[in-house]
Amino acid sequence: MDNRPIGLLDSGVGGLTVARELLRQLPNEEIVYIGDTRRAPYGPRSREQIIAFTWDMVNFLLSKNVKMIVMACNTATAMALEIVKEELDIPVIGVILPGASSAIQKTKTNKIGVIATQASIRSDEYHKTIARKSSAIEVLSLACPKFVSIVESNEMESEIAKRVVSESLAPLVGKIDTLILGCTHYPLLRPLIQETMGKEVRLIDSGAEAVRDISVLLNYFEINAHERKEFQHCFYTTAGVNSFREIAEKWLNIGHLHIEHAEIENFNKEK
Protein backbone atom coordinates (compact mmCIF):
# COMPACT_ATOMS: atom_id res chain seq x y z
CA MET A 1 0.00 0.00 0.00
CA ASP A 2 1.20 3.51 -0.82
CA ASN A 3 -0.60 6.73 0.06
CA ARG A 4 1.56 8.99 -2.09
CA PRO A 5 -0.42 10.86 -4.76
CA ILE A 6 -0.79 10.03 -8.44
CA GLY A 7 0.56 12.76 -10.70
CA LEU A 8 -1.36 13.85 -13.79
CA LEU A 9 -0.03 16.20 -16.46
CA ASP A 10 -1.61 17.96 -19.41
CA SER A 11 -1.12 21.00 -21.61
CA GLY A 12 -4.09 22.62 -19.87
CA VAL A 13 -7.53 21.62 -18.61
CA GLY A 14 -8.01 18.59 -20.88
CA GLY A 15 -6.51 16.16 -18.40
CA LEU A 16 -9.36 16.97 -16.03
CA THR A 17 -11.38 14.47 -18.05
CA VAL A 18 -8.92 11.82 -16.87
CA ALA A 19 -8.94 13.19 -13.33
CA ARG A 20 -12.74 12.95 -13.18
CA GLU A 21 -12.71 9.30 -14.20
CA LEU A 22 -9.85 8.55 -11.81
CA LEU A 23 -11.75 10.11 -8.91
CA ARG A 24 -14.82 8.07 -9.83
CA GLN A 25 -13.08 4.72 -10.26
CA LEU A 26 -10.35 5.09 -7.62
CA PRO A 27 -11.81 7.25 -4.82
CA ASN A 28 -9.05 6.39 -2.33
CA GLU A 29 -6.33 7.83 -4.55
CA GLU A 30 -5.00 11.36 -4.10
CA ILE A 31 -4.25 13.47 -7.19
CA VAL A 32 -1.64 16.10 -7.97
CA TYR A 33 -2.42 17.71 -11.33
CA ILE A 34 -0.35 20.13 -13.41
CA GLY A 35 -1.80 21.90 -16.45
CA ASP A 36 0.60 23.94 -18.58
CA THR A 37 -2.07 26.40 -19.67
CA ARG A 38 0.41 29.22 -20.34
CA ARG A 39 2.11 27.29 -23.15
CA ALA A 40 -1.03 25.59 -24.51
CA PRO A 41 -1.92 24.40 -27.03
CA TYR A 42 0.86 21.88 -27.58
CA GLY A 43 -0.49 20.72 -30.94
CA PRO A 44 1.35 23.28 -33.14
CA ARG A 45 4.62 22.86 -31.20
CA SER A 46 7.68 20.99 -32.43
CA ARG A 47 8.56 17.55 -31.08
CA GLU A 48 11.54 19.04 -29.23
CA GLN A 49 9.40 21.68 -27.54
CA ILE A 50 6.76 19.17 -26.49
CA ILE A 51 9.37 16.85 -24.98
CA ALA A 52 10.98 19.75 -23.09
CA PHE A 53 7.64 21.02 -21.78
CA THR A 54 6.65 17.50 -20.75
CA TRP A 55 9.87 17.14 -18.76
CA ASP A 56 9.08 20.43 -16.98
CA MET A 57 5.76 18.96 -15.85
CA VAL A 58 7.28 15.58 -14.99
CA ASN A 59 9.95 17.16 -12.80
CA PHE A 60 7.34 19.33 -11.10
CA LEU A 61 5.29 16.24 -10.27
CA LEU A 62 8.37 14.40 -9.02
CA SER A 63 8.95 17.28 -6.60
CA LYS A 64 5.51 16.45 -5.15
CA ASN A 65 6.62 12.86 -4.38
CA VAL A 66 4.15 11.14 -6.71
CA LYS A 67 4.10 7.34 -6.97
CA MET A 68 2.95 7.23 -10.61
CA ILE A 69 2.72 9.68 -13.50
CA VAL A 70 -0.21 9.74 -15.90
CA MET A 71 0.37 11.60 -19.15
CA ALA A 72 -3.22 12.79 -19.40
CA CYS A 73 -2.33 14.43 -22.70
CA ASN A 74 -2.31 12.63 -26.04
CA THR A 75 0.27 14.99 -27.54
CA ALA A 76 2.70 14.46 -24.66
CA THR A 77 2.04 10.71 -24.82
CA ALA A 78 2.78 10.60 -28.54
CA MET A 79 6.02 12.56 -28.29
CA ALA A 80 7.48 11.85 -24.86
CA LEU A 81 6.01 8.76 -23.17
CA GLU A 82 8.73 6.26 -24.07
CA ILE A 83 11.51 8.78 -23.35
CA VAL A 84 10.17 9.54 -19.88
CA LYS A 85 9.46 5.89 -19.06
CA GLU A 86 13.08 5.00 -19.77
CA GLU A 87 14.35 7.60 -17.29
CA LEU A 88 12.04 7.10 -14.32
CA ASP A 89 11.79 4.34 -11.75
CA ILE A 90 8.08 4.88 -11.07
CA PRO A 91 5.25 3.75 -13.38
CA VAL A 92 4.40 6.13 -16.24
CA ILE A 93 1.26 5.62 -18.32
CA GLY A 94 -0.09 7.37 -21.40
CA VAL A 95 -3.51 7.53 -23.01
CA ILE A 96 -2.97 6.32 -26.59
CA LEU A 97 -2.74 2.54 -26.11
CA PRO A 98 -5.86 2.30 -23.89
CA GLY A 99 -7.90 4.37 -26.35
CA ALA A 100 -6.71 2.41 -29.38
CA SER A 101 -7.38 -0.94 -27.70
CA SER A 102 -10.92 0.06 -26.74
CA ALA A 103 -11.70 1.29 -30.26
CA ILE A 104 -10.54 -2.01 -31.76
CA GLN A 105 -12.90 -3.87 -29.44
CA LYS A 106 -15.87 -1.60 -30.17
CA THR A 107 -15.77 -1.21 -33.97
CA LYS A 108 -18.07 -3.43 -36.00
CA THR A 109 -17.17 -2.12 -39.47
CA ASN A 110 -13.37 -1.93 -38.96
CA LYS A 111 -13.49 1.78 -39.75
CA ILE A 112 -12.13 3.91 -36.92
CA GLY A 113 -11.71 7.67 -36.85
CA VAL A 114 -9.14 9.54 -34.77
CA ILE A 115 -9.40 13.23 -33.96
CA ALA A 116 -6.48 14.87 -32.20
CA THR A 117 -4.06 17.81 -32.24
CA GLN A 118 -1.77 18.46 -35.18
CA ALA A 119 1.24 17.02 -33.34
CA SER A 120 -0.58 13.82 -32.40
CA ILE A 121 -1.81 13.32 -35.95
CA ARG A 122 1.69 14.01 -37.35
CA SER A 123 3.14 11.39 -35.02
CA ASP A 124 0.68 8.80 -36.41
CA GLU A 125 0.83 6.99 -33.05
CA TYR A 126 -2.83 5.97 -33.00
CA HIS A 127 -2.63 4.58 -36.53
CA LYS A 128 0.58 2.67 -35.75
CA THR A 129 -0.80 1.34 -32.46
CA ILE A 130 -4.01 0.10 -34.09
CA ALA A 131 -2.10 -1.41 -37.05
CA ARG A 132 0.10 -3.41 -34.67
CA LYS A 133 -3.01 -4.97 -33.15
CA SER A 134 -5.14 -5.40 -36.28
CA SER A 135 -4.13 -4.93 -39.90
CA ALA A 136 -7.76 -5.23 -41.01
CA ILE A 137 -8.83 -1.88 -39.56
CA GLU A 138 -8.94 1.29 -41.63
CA VAL A 139 -8.00 4.41 -39.66
CA LEU A 140 -9.11 7.88 -40.74
CA SER A 141 -7.18 10.59 -38.88
CA LEU A 142 -8.18 14.23 -38.61
CA ALA A 143 -6.50 17.14 -36.83
CA CYS A 144 -8.95 19.43 -35.01
CA PRO A 145 -6.69 22.25 -33.79
CA LYS A 146 -9.49 24.65 -32.87
CA PHE A 147 -11.06 22.32 -30.30
CA VAL A 148 -8.40 22.88 -27.62
CA SER A 149 -8.72 26.67 -27.82
CA ILE A 150 -12.50 26.42 -27.46
CA VAL A 151 -12.14 24.32 -24.30
CA GLU A 152 -9.34 26.40 -22.77
CA SER A 153 -11.44 29.56 -23.27
CA ASN A 154 -14.47 27.85 -21.69
CA GLU A 155 -16.59 28.26 -24.83
CA MET A 156 -17.84 24.65 -24.97
CA GLU A 157 -21.53 25.59 -25.03
CA SER A 158 -21.27 28.51 -27.44
CA GLU A 159 -22.65 28.81 -30.96
CA ILE A 160 -19.07 29.19 -32.18
CA ALA A 161 -18.20 25.81 -30.66
CA LYS A 162 -21.19 24.19 -32.37
CA ARG A 163 -20.18 25.61 -35.75
CA VAL A 164 -16.49 24.74 -35.39
CA VAL A 165 -17.21 21.15 -34.34
CA SER A 166 -19.69 20.63 -37.16
CA GLU A 167 -17.37 22.05 -39.82
CA SER A 168 -14.25 20.31 -38.50
CA LEU A 169 -15.79 16.83 -38.34
CA ALA A 170 -17.53 16.98 -41.72
CA PRO A 171 -14.83 14.86 -43.47
CA LEU A 172 -15.56 11.93 -41.11
CA VAL A 173 -19.36 11.96 -41.06
CA GLY A 174 -20.82 8.74 -42.46
CA LYS A 175 -17.42 7.08 -42.93
CA ILE A 176 -16.72 5.46 -39.53
CA ASP A 177 -18.57 3.66 -36.74
CA THR A 178 -16.09 4.42 -33.95
CA LEU A 179 -14.33 7.70 -33.15
CA ILE A 180 -11.38 8.06 -30.79
CA LEU A 181 -11.32 11.38 -28.95
CA GLY A 182 -7.54 11.54 -29.25
CA CYS A 183 -7.07 14.60 -27.09
CA THR A 184 -8.16 14.75 -23.47
CA HIS A 185 -9.71 18.18 -24.08
CA TYR A 186 -12.21 16.74 -26.53
CA PRO A 187 -14.57 14.93 -24.10
CA LEU A 188 -15.53 18.40 -22.88
CA LEU A 189 -17.05 18.82 -26.35
CA ARG A 190 -18.60 15.35 -26.36
CA PRO A 191 -22.27 16.40 -26.75
CA LEU A 192 -21.45 18.47 -29.84
CA ILE A 193 -19.21 15.77 -31.28
CA GLN A 194 -21.88 13.10 -30.78
CA GLU A 195 -24.55 15.32 -32.32
CA THR A 196 -22.37 15.95 -35.37
CA MET A 197 -21.26 12.35 -35.90
CA GLY A 198 -24.64 10.78 -35.16
CA LYS A 199 -25.83 8.68 -32.25
CA GLU A 200 -24.78 5.43 -33.97
CA VAL A 201 -21.08 6.36 -33.81
CA ARG A 202 -19.29 5.14 -30.68
CA LEU A 203 -17.08 7.77 -29.05
CA ILE A 204 -13.95 6.49 -27.29
CA ASP A 205 -12.63 8.65 -24.45
CA SER A 206 -8.94 7.73 -24.42
CA GLY A 207 -8.39 9.28 -21.00
CA ALA A 208 -11.23 7.40 -19.35
CA GLU A 209 -9.98 4.16 -20.87
CA ALA A 210 -6.53 4.86 -19.38
CA VAL A 211 -7.91 4.83 -15.84
CA ARG A 212 -8.63 1.11 -16.13
CA ASP A 213 -4.95 0.58 -16.92
CA ILE A 214 -3.98 2.81 -13.99
CA SER A 215 -5.95 0.53 -11.69
CA VAL A 216 -4.19 -2.54 -13.10
CA LEU A 217 -0.75 -0.95 -12.57
CA LEU A 218 -1.57 0.09 -9.01
CA ASN A 219 -2.45 -3.51 -8.22
CA TYR A 220 0.54 -4.94 -10.08
CA PHE A 221 3.07 -2.76 -8.25
CA GLU A 222 1.10 -3.00 -4.98
CA ILE A 223 0.94 0.77 -4.60
CA ASN A 224 -2.79 1.22 -4.03
CA ALA A 225 -3.70 3.77 -1.39
CA HIS A 226 -5.13 2.72 1.97
CA GLU A 227 -8.76 3.59 2.53
CA ARG A 228 -8.70 6.92 4.33
CA LYS A 229 -11.08 9.66 5.33
CA GLU A 230 -9.07 12.81 4.67
CA PHE A 231 -6.67 13.87 1.92
CA GLN A 232 -6.46 16.82 -0.43
CA HIS A 233 -6.28 16.79 -4.21
CA CYS A 234 -3.98 19.55 -5.49
CA PHE A 235 -4.32 21.19 -8.89
CA TYR A 236 -1.72 23.51 -10.41
CA THR A 237 -1.85 25.62 -13.55
CA THR A 238 0.79 27.79 -15.20
CA ALA A 239 -1.75 30.50 -16.11
CA GLY A 240 -5.36 31.53 -15.63
CA VAL A 241 -6.13 30.21 -12.15
CA ASN A 242 -9.67 31.64 -12.13
CA SER A 243 -10.57 30.20 -15.53
CA PHE A 244 -9.02 26.86 -14.59
CA ARG A 245 -11.03 26.83 -11.36
CA GLU A 246 -14.29 27.56 -13.16
CA ILE A 247 -13.80 24.69 -15.61
CA ALA A 248 -12.39 22.27 -13.02
CA GLU A 249 -15.08 22.75 -10.39
CA LYS A 250 -17.85 22.44 -12.98
CA TRP A 251 -16.36 19.39 -14.73
CA LEU A 252 -15.34 17.56 -11.55
CA ASN A 253 -18.47 18.66 -9.68
CA ILE A 254 -16.35 19.54 -6.66
CA GLY A 255 -16.38 22.92 -4.95
CA HIS A 256 -13.49 24.74 -3.29
CA LEU A 257 -10.73 22.84 -5.06
CA HIS A 258 -7.15 23.48 -4.02
CA ILE A 259 -5.81 25.26 -7.12
CA GLU A 260 -2.53 27.18 -7.31
CA HIS A 261 -0.41 28.93 -9.90
CA ALA A 262 2.86 27.11 -10.64
CA GLU A 263 6.06 28.12 -12.40
CA ILE A 264 7.44 25.05 -14.15
CA GLU A 265 9.58 26.37 -17.01
CA ASN A 266 12.92 24.55 -16.90
CA PHE A 267 11.76 23.06 -13.61
CA ASN A 268 14.37 21.00 -11.82
CA LYS A 269 13.31 18.48 -9.22
CA GLU A 270 16.31 19.41 -7.06
CA LYS A 271 14.96 22.96 -6.55
Swiss-Prot record:
Gene Ontology BP term (one): regulation of cell shape
InterPro entries: Asp/Glu/hydantoin_racemase, Asp/Glu_race, Asp/Glu_racemase_AS_1, Asp/Glu_racemase_AS_2, Glu_race
EC number: 5.1.1.3
Source organism superkingdom: Bacteria
Record: active site: C73, C183
Statement: the UniProt record of this protein carries the keyword Isomerase: yes
Coiled coil: none
Example GO molecular function: glutamate racemase activity
Catalytic reaction annotation: L-glutamate = D-glutamate
Positions with a binding annotation for substrate: D10, S11, Y42, G43, N74, T75, T184, H185
Keywords assigned by UniProt, alphabetized: Cell shape, Cell wall biogenesis/degradation, Isomerase, Peptidoglycan synthesis
Pathway field: Cell wall biogenesis; peptidoglycan biosynthesis
Membership in a protein family: Belongs to the aspartate/glutamate racemases family.
Function, in words: Provides the (R)-glutamate required for cell wall biosynthesis.
HAMAP family: Glu_racemase
Record's protein name: Glutamate racemase
Organism: Lactococcus lactis subsp. cremoris (strain MG1363)
Gene it is expressed from: murI
